[in-house]
């Protein structure tokens, strides 16, 4: 889960990585829709045209209606772990989530498990649950999942899952989980500079280097079910 440094280190680095990959003709996908609540206008304002703007509005509103139809609020978001790590509100967490999209325009909005067909930044309908969201990314055609964390988790999706730490303490303590440490930004450097190192690392993963979770033999999957998933 996220912590107080996620929106300062790891998420901005992933956002800069996204911009870099898109500038080279690639595609990136942002999901975890409930974690966009409160910061969704940052994405809406970057939609390429009015049609995509309306699709983004529907993406957000449909997920809110999904919760309401089951008589549920967005419970435990931020989660207890998020709060212990320094996140106080949903908006705080959401502003961190949207940073992972960088600054590129939104080029497409995808339904759950819909295949990526457009270069650039895509938004995908899926919940905030780590494994469900990562499985949805894989189902939509993502070759690699970049997962930022300040609290740590050993999980992995069906595709190579690169675990990115927001703080050096986690990277040092769980070196068998964490692939890339963004905690160094607290002492030196910028997200743009570190994103180039992350880009090179992801190229290595795409070329056959195993992520820490692959070395451990972890390949998990979770399907979006009826009922509320945070």
Where are these regions (language model features)?
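Anaerobic metallocofactor- and corrinoid-dependent redox/one-carbon enzyme cores
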Residues: 1-230
């Amino acid at each position: 889960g996220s912590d107080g440094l996620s929106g300062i280190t790891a998420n901005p680095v992933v956002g800069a990585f996204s911009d870099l990959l898109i500038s080279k003709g690639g595609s990136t996908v942002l999901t975890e829709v409930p974690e966009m609540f409160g910061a969704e206008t940052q994405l809406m304002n970057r939609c390429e045209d009015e049609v995509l703007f309306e699709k983004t509005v529907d993406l957000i509103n449909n997920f809110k209606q999904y919760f309401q139809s089951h008589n549920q609020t967005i419970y435990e978001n931020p989660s207890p772990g998020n709060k212990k790590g320094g996140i106080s509100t949903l908006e705080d967490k959401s502003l961190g989530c949207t940073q992972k999209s960088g600054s590129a325009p939104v080029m497409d909005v995808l339904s759950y498990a819909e295949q990526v067909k457009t270069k650039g930044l895509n938004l995908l309908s899926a919940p905030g649950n780590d494994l469900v969201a990562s499985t949805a990314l894989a189902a939509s055609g993502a070759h690699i999942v970049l997962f930022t964390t300040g609290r740590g988790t050993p999980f992995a999706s069906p595709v190579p899952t690169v675990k990115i730490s927001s703080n050096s303490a986690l990277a040092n303590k769980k070196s068998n989980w964490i692939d890339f440490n963004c905690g160094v930004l607290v002492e030196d450097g910028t997200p743009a500079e570190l994103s180039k190192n992350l880009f090179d690392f992801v190229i290595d993963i795409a070329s056959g280097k195993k992520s820490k979770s692959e070395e451990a033999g972890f390949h998990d999957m979770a399907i979006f079910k009826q009922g509320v998933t945070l």
